A protein has these predicted regions:
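A structural signal for short hydrophobic beta-strand segments in well-ordered beta-sheet cores
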Residues: 82, 116-118
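Short, solvent-exposed loop/turn segments at secondary-structure boundaries
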Residues: 47-48, 103-107
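Beta-strand elements of well-folded, non-transmembrane domains
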Residues: 26, 98-102, 118, 135
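Surface-exposed, charged secondary-structure patches
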Residues: 13, 42, 58-104, 156-162
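Low-complexity, intrinsically disordered terminal/linker segments enriched in charged
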Residues: 120-121, 127-163
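Hydrophobic pocket/interface hotspot
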Residues: 21, 33-34, 41, 53, ...
Length: 163
């Protein structure tokens, strides 16, 4: 298999995994969602909480689908990159959002970026690692940026003098 064909195949595999995650999410099937992960997977939620293993991932999503994420659907955005790490591993970076029924599309405030480590086991691609983070561009200009930058420099300089 040549590199271009391999990349396309992995891209299709990544799309299939993301579609399966969305299907289980939309069905509010926490345990089915968990089955898409390896038994020893790690999952970092957008708020930084670490879930370890398929069982914990499934149980947390089951709880969330019955409470805070009740009635939501998972909208997968674009796949920004797919990078193969050998025959049976790939790193996928994509965007997406969980939307409530009254939301028609993902607003910038709700949009997240995910990094997934996919692992092929017994011919099936599963998620071995998942990191989810809200997309919040870091300001690099403007009056608030200038004030915050000066405040940081003052505090750092003060701490260095005190040390």
């Amino acid at each position: 298999m040549n590199a271009t064909h391999e990349t396309r195949a992995t891209d299709l595999d990544a799309r299939a995994v993301l579609a399966a995650l969305a299907d289980r999410w939309d069905a509010a099937d926490g345990h089915g969602y968990g089955e898409l992960f390896t038994p020893d997977a790690t999952y970092v939620q957008f708020n930084g909480v670490l879930l370890s293993g398929r069982r914990e991932i499934a149980e947390m999503h089951d709880l969330m689908f019955r409470t805070m994420l009740y009635g939501t659907r998972l909208v997968t955005g674009e796949i920004e990159s797919v990078r193969r790490l050998g025959e049976d591993h790939a790193v996928v970076v994509s965007t997406g959002a969980a939307l409530y029924p009254w939301q028609k599309e993902a607003t910038p405030k709700r949009l997240s970026r995910q990094t997934l480590l996919l692992e092929r086991r017994d011919g099936r691609w599963l998620v071995a690692g998942f990191q989810n983070a809200r997309i919040k561009p870091f300001p690099t200009s403007g009056p608030l940026f200038e004030v915050a930058s000066r405040a940081v420099r003052l505090r750092v300089d003060r701490a260095r003098r005190a040390a």
